[in-house]
Amino acid sequence: MAAQRIRAANSSGLPRCKSEGTLIDLSEGFSETSFNDVKVPSPSALLVDNPTPFGNAKEVIAIKDYCPNNFTTLKFSKGDHLYVLDTSGGEWWYAHNTTEMGYIPSSYVQPLNYRNSTLSDSGMIDNLPDSPDEVAKELDLLGGWTDDQKQSGRPYSNNPFWNGVRTNPFLNGNAQPSMDELNPKSTVDLLLFDTGTSSFTESSSATTNSTGNIFDELPATNGIHLEQPVKRDNPFFRSKRSYSLSELSVLQAKSDAPPTSSFFTGLKSPAPEQFQSREDFRTAWLNHRKLARSCHDLDLLGQSPGWGQTQAVETNIVCKLDSSGGSVQLPDTSISIHVPEGHVAPGETQQISMKALLDPPLDLNSDRSTSISPVVEVKLSNLEVSTFIILEMKVSAEVKGDIFSKSTVVLQCLRSDSKEGPYAPIPLAYSYGDTIQVQLDNLEPCMYLAIVAQGSNILYPSTVWDFIHKRVTVGLYGPKHIHPSFKTVVTIFGHDCAPKTLLVTEVTRQAPSPAPVALQLWGKHQFILSRPQDLRVCMFSNMTNYDVKSNEQAKVVRGFQMKLGKVSRLIFSVISQNPNELSDFTLRVQVKDDQDTILTQFCVQTPQPPPKSAIKPSGQRRFLKKNEVGKIILSPFVVTTKYPTFQDRPVSSLKFGKLLKTVVRQNKSHYLLEYKKGDVVALLSEERIRLKGQLWTKEWYIGYYQGKVGLVHTKNVLVVGKARPSLFSGPELSTSVLLEQILRPCKFLTYIYASVRTLLMENISSWRAFADALGYGNLPLTFFCRAELDSEPERVASVLEKLKEDCNNPDNKDRKSFQKELVMALLKMDCQGLVVRLIQDFVLLTTAVEVAQRWRELAEKLAKVSKQQMDAYESPHRDRNGVVDSEAMWKPAYDFLLTWSHQIGDSYRDVIQELHIGLDKMKNPITRRWKHLTGTLILVNSLDILRAAAFSPADHDDFVI
């Protein structure tokens, strides 16, 4: 029940994550100690009969037996003593015994000297007192605890939600004031997992562990004293609330240890004196807490949080093949799939989607196994096949040439239907050197495959690394152009696949947060690593004008990170001494072992600084000024585009389903089908759309029934396959009928003409093809403009202007919708990417106009935006009296929706789907009367099948996402 209450208490705040750890009781004192200088033990250290914990490893005792079911977990029996190295995994901790290391379930162990009145094994409160008096008795058991706290340092007051006591910011229990006037200000560092190592000074500064460490409940040692507890009349004692450890900042740890390098790095939380009001401080504190859950190198960020979140853009390709077969290769990788001729029946197609997932699941790496390739996700659209397919790739390891190694370790392909496993071995069809081929039978809609080097008979202290030559890839990422101050990211991969782009999210105190920045791969280098060990990565510049920050010149990647195959990301800041003399230069990256021996080094030439004419203001305008329109230059990709011919022919790749229920709707909707039990409906795809029905959110298929395209509830359909049943009645679905049906909602969408005009001028290379698609065939250019136009973008704009005049002409009896005619023409030109950009902009703008004054309610449903952030969206649009006019309320709504859509990502389907769900959650949702957003969902989810049917495979190349 305590867990349910805390989840309810936190439901309006930031989501909980694994790093928050266990739940604790405020009635117990605890010291938040940190994991500093965590070290991986050597085999000899593990063989000692009575081992001593190394570094700050925490000793625990097993309370029940555990028998592992995979390579990465550690076997132990009740009463065994274990030493925990890392607890950031939440339910799984990384620990070692006297012989080996591995993951253990946190609920199966408890610390030594553990008091059963604080925590149970599962992180829930055990034997919780029933009254505040019992809490007082519990606190009195600590003996001199209340005296010790008087001598301790000042509690850090960086939590804006408590005056004097740092605890859950979303609760307002009474707290005992701190001794701010008696003690100097100290610093709190939040510690995170998966960071690089950086030096930091520990004088009077204290550290607060954000990983939710159960060991922080143990008595303090080495001069670390406990802080003053909260008052016993706290209302949350009476309600027996429990809190996550990362939400508690009540106590402070002090240490006189000398400065050390740690696997974890620090992030200073904002201080109250930096802000003018408590609300500003609250917003900054929330941003800081959000950052602390996801960043990889916190010490870089300091008081001004900078680039905190890095994510590799996983390489992905989608390709459609017919019965003649072919090959599909992931761009910039050596991973490909070969499809034999006759794989599918003539007239049918097979759509293959491949993605390289860079971080392997934990099950694939242990002492006896190591992953030597990325996890490859393969998705197939058609399972009615007659042949197998072949996966071919190069791996990052080779078995050593001696007979013993070849007999001990083999390269093995593992397959699973889920990314996290379990994985089952499948035989290799071909293996020579670092090239392997795998024959894939029993095809599934989604498969995950990985190559590992595995030796099931390896005995401790040997590991699989002793029998292979494993290559490690080091990549250096940076901005497209260098600037007076910029950041680079060094990544270490356990395989050959280094993506061309790395996304970096800059977390700031301003709202809204900026869109992610894409860093380019400047260069990469491979070297053979003999064993998983600590690696020190150093960076130097060859020019005196550029300096790598001195405290960032060396960072550490821990050995067990290498063993687990995780991608390591280290951020280095580079600063120019003279910003007026910018030029490209060379960066040298060194990788050293723990003995400071150079394992490898390589140099990378940086890009040039941006040309002066290319420097633009940071704020992005919605549309161009009039004098800028003529300066638009077409992209070279657009210039070479050839527009295919739209074919009006039957849509063949349909699936059919039998209707299990008769549905007649009281409230008629263009987008929800009515149907009879026993009839047959054609399904455009088996992808499901989520939206609210009469009472609750349901899942729907896009169906075609009796000449209408609409949604049908998935529970009312039994999918029977691709064979067309004889009972199917109604007109045949052709591409022109499908196009007309799905474009129905377009005429109800709002648009900004200047924005549409700019977008088309930038992306359409032929005014002639554009005019023909709009129905202005064989008309000369003079029909659209009087003066002679020099550039192609201006000619495209003149055709668009003519379309606008015709659609808005009141004398025209057959008035058409500008939006519908434009989208139809672009789809006939096979400009699907341009269409989805327009549709998403239309949807966001229309939603902003429809929601208007209720946009704050929508913002709370979509992103749980705070009141201060909402005020920040409205502030640019306030008048002299500080009020936003009701007719201008769409502007802050539109600004918010644009920012929110960038945070969702590049998937236009996800943006519109999540927007629909958010609108459905509102009180008296606008989707009840304005149902055209549902039609837009049908539109964007039908584009693929329309494109596949309207254009032959020879008309367009494979497209890469």
Curated annotation (Swiss-Prot):
Q: What is its main location?
A: membrane
As stated in the Swiss-Prot or TrEMBL entry, residues carrying the post-translational modification Phosphoserine are S131, S244, S249, S277, S294, S635
CDD domains, A to Z: SH3_SH3BP4
Question: Per its UniProt record, what SUPFAM superfamilies does this chain match?
Answer: SH3-domain
Start and end residues of each SH3 domain: 55-114, 652-722
The answer to whether keyword Iron applies is no
Top-level lineage group? Eukaryota
Q: Which residues form the signal peptide?
A: none
How does it get modified after it is made? Phosphorylated upon EGF stimulation. Phosphorylation prevents interaction with DNM2.
Its GO biological process annotations read:
cellular response to amino acid stimulus; endocytosis; negative regulation of cell growth; negative regulation of cell population proliferation; negative regulation of GTPase activity; negative regulation of TOR signaling; positive regulation of autophagy; protein localization to lysosome
GO cellular component term of the entry, any: cytoplasm
Keywords, A to Z, come to: Coated pit, Cytoplasmic vesicle, Endocytosis, Membrane, Nucleus, Phosphoprotein, Repeat, SH3 domain
Q: Which sequence ranges form a coiled-coil region, renumbered to this chain? A: none
Report the locations given in the UniProt record.
Membrane, Clathrin-coated pit; Cytoplasmic vesicle, Clathrin-coated vesicle; Nucleus
List the Gene Ontology MF annotations in alphabetical order: GDP-dissociation inhibitor activity; identical protein binding; small GTPase binding
Record domain ZU5: where: 315-452
Domain free text: The SH3 domain mediates localization to the clathrin-coated pits and vesicles. The SH3 domain mediates interaction with DNM2 and the cytoplasmic part of TFRC with a lower affinity. The SH3 domain also mediates interaction with RRAGB, RRAGC and is required for the negative regulation of mTORC1.
Q: How does it assemble?
A: Homodimer or homooligomer. Interacts with DNM2, EPS15, clathrin, the adapter protein complex 2/AP-2 and TFRC. Interacts with the Rag GTPases RRAGA, RRAGB, RRAGC and RRAGD; the interaction is most probably direct, preferentially occurs with their inactive GDP-bound form and is negatively regulated by amino acids.
Job description of the protein: May function in transferrin receptor internalization at the plasma membrane through a cargo-specific control of clathrin-mediated endocytosis. Alternatively, may act as a negative regulator of the amino acid-induced TOR signaling by inhibiting the formation of active Rag GTPase complexes. Preferentially binds inactive Rag GTPase complexes and prevents their interaction with the mTORC1 complex inhibiting its relocalization to lysosomes and its activation. Thereby, may indirectly regulate cell growth, proliferation and autophagy.
What name is this protein filed under?
SH3 domain-binding protein 4
Q: Which organism is it from?
A: Rattus norvegicus
